[in-house]
UniProtKB/Swiss-Prot annotation:
Coiled coil: none annotated. This is Spanin, outer membrane subunit. The lineage of its organism: Viruses, Duplodnaviria, Heunggongvirae, Uroviricota, Caudoviricetes. It comes from Escherichia phage 933W. Its main location: host cell. A lipid is attached at C20 (N-palmitoyl cysteine). Keywords: Cytolysis, Disulfide bond, Host cell lysis by virus, Host cell outer membrane, Host membrane, Lipoprotein, Membrane, Palmitate, Signal, Viral release from host cell. It is found in: Host cell outer membrane. It holds the Pfam family Rz1. GO terms for biological process: viral release from host cell by cytolysis. A lipid is attached at C20 (S-diacylglycerol cysteine). InterPro entries: O-spanin. The keyword Methyltransferase does not apply.
């Protein structure tokens, strides 16, 4: 049992040493998203007025 622990220790030691010695990767620069398209910035269309005209004219008849 003692030999097994010793073998595991010997096998794990290089992994631990190499992990501590390696440099962490450089952070990725934050990329600014592009500006939204122009059609998104326009006001929403007014659907209420045309629908009121359709509904009122059908109620009269």
């Amino acid at each position: 049992m003692r030999e097994l622990k010793m073998k595991l220790c010997v096998l794990m030691l290089p992994l631990v040493v190499s992990a501590c010695g390696s440099t962490p990767p450089a952070p990725v620069p934050c990329v600014k998203p592009p500006a939204p398209p122009a059609w998104i910035m326009q006001p929403a269309p007014d659907w209420q007025t045309p629908l009121n005209g359709i509904i009122s004219s059908s109620e009269r008849g």
